[in-house]
Amino acid sequence: LRLLPFRVPLAVPMKEALAELEVWGADVIFGRAKGFRAGMMRLAMSALSGVYRAIVQTRLLVFRKRWKQQHHLGTLVVSIGNLTVGGTGKTPVVELLSRTLRDEGRRVAILSRGYKSRRLKEPQNWKSKDGTKFPAEKMPKLVSTGRALLLDSKFAGDEPFMLARNLDGVAVVVDKDRVKGGRFAVGQLGADTLLLDDGLQYLHLSHAIDIVLIDRSAPFGTGALLPRGTLREPPRNLCRASYILITKCDGTPNDALIAKLRRYNRVAPIIECTHGPRYLEEVFTGQRQPLEFLKDKWTAAISGIAVPEGFERGIEDLGARLEIRRRFSDHHRFSRKEIEKFMQRCVERDMELVVTTEKDAVRFPRPKEQTVPIYFLRIEVEILKGHDAWNDLVTRLCHPSAPGDPVLRHRDAYAQ
């Protein structure tokens, strides 16, 4: 622990020390960490980014040349993803598209990796259509059948659990092997539309459509590839997008950004949308409050997300007096001790309420004594511009044309 780039008491468990190290690593990437050690770490990360770039482009070449075959499941597969790591507002978009397709009569299943979810001690029991027990080795984690929620966030993962809880009539399946999950969704759940959550980089399964999200405030993240930056792929790989969604817009023109995006993709329809807060909901009681409830209240924010600045700024924009900011690593699983320690700090500072994100709320253990109310901020997506393109997307998915329709053909547009 003495070797860590920050002071950690020797009594602190290794798990907590590693969590702090992960937060520091994010601070290095985003430029928040200063000093000699942070500078040296950035130099090392920059060198590794060159290696990472070569690996990414080689992998794309392998699939483009078909040296490694993609799997086709005989049904419609749509990927929703981004070029960067986190922060684009993907989950609300997945929820919106899933709900829209469901309402139009499609039998939708969401396929997710279940990032940082825990492994089940034993596979779930599932009976095949013929009444026999489904083979355990072919069984993914079934979060929701669309009618019943079967797993909690610990075993499902944050986003899959949140989506399953919010989407009646939409199945949610988790497995690192999305081909395996897709086969189960089609064969056992009767899905005719598979939404590949965070699926742009998942090339083992053929996509009919790739929807790529671009954060208006940071279109290409920090501008550098992993691990020095937040880019998973070079910007030129945007050429693989079938549709581009610019997220977190505020209604002002995006002409300069659109011109930049057109350098990499000249044909994909561009849709502009906003991620707006709708209401506050108490984490444990479900009681809802209007957004005006925040105005002039002494507030503490706690989160474990990739880019917390936007979340915290949103709280301030709603008129809250944000006095305490507590940041954990992305997808951090809060312990009761951590929450109670944070709540004690809030009491000592006379905070009137605590606000977190909806994704973090699913990981909150209930404290023994809740001295300050804890709310999550419900965020929903609204299309601002590109309604025709959005309607065209929905129409093509709900009413597929003849096989010659270019949007439903197998895509080979991998970056050269």
Question: Regions from the language model: what does each represent?
Answer:
Residues 97, 182, 342:
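Aromatic/hydrophobic pocket-lining residues that form π-stacking "cages" and hydrophobic walls in ligand
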Residues 114-265, 270-272, 279:
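Phosphate/Mg2+-binding loops and adjacent switch elements
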Residues 61-129, 140-147:
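Walker A (P-loop) phosphate-binding motif
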Residues 46-49, 53-55, 184, 395, ...:
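Compositional signal for N-terminal targeting/processing segments
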Residues 3-6, 10-30, 35, 103, ...:
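ATP-dependent carboxylate-amine ligase
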